């Protein structure tokens, strides 16, 4: 069983998504059975708390973030859709890999924004990203998903604080 892992695309407005189309073409060529996106597919800079109030923050808009995420996902998935349309027309086998996506801390900015300002509840949500409509099975931020005996998560936490674990090597060499 072959897995293909896509980490941290961090799609944002103004970005060129040609690289995602190339990844999609590679997927069609190699046909891994399972594709795992490890989160932060969308960057969501409009919801970043890092540089709020700074000049560089002005002009960021939630709707533009969502649009960028959709454009990026379309770039990634278009080669698969095009391949399957040709295959269907020619009565050939279509390529239907399992698609798994763990939400990352950048997507989680949506939840944090709602928790910080309850007026946003019902106005913005993970559903705006529409990952499921693109065929992905979506897992909550920091959930560990085991696929074919391999554990996947946006990052693995350590201790009670929920901080990211250090490298595997550091974990193994802890005394």
Please place each PLM-identified region on the residue numbering.
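N-terminal active-site segment of His-dependent metallophosphoesterases
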Residues: 1-74, 87
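Conserved catalytic scaffold of divalent metal-dependent phosphoesterases
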Residues: 68-175
């Amino acid at each position: 069983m072959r897995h293909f892992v896509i980490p941290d695309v961090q799609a944002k407005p103004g970005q060129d998504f040609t690289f995602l189309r190339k990844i999609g073409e590679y997927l069609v060529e190699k046909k891994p059975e399972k594709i795992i996106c490890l989160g932060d597919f969308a960057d969501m800079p409009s919801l970043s708390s890092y540089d709020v109030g700074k000049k560089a923050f002005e002009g960021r808009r939630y709707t533009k973030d969502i649009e960028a995420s959709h454009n990026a996902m379309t770039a990634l998935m278009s080669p698969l859709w095009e391949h399957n349309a040709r295959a269907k027309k020619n009565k050939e086998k279509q390529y239907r890999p399992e698609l798994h996506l763990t939400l990352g801390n950048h997507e989680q900015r949506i939840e944090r924004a709602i928790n910080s300002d309850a007026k946003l509840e019902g106005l913005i949500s993970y559903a705006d990203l529409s990952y499921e409509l693109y065929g992905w099975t979506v897992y909550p931020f920091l959930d560990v998903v085991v696929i074919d005996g391999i554990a996947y998560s946006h990052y693995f936490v350590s201790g009670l604080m929920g901080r990211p674990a250090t490298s595997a090597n550091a974990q193994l060499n802890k005394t």
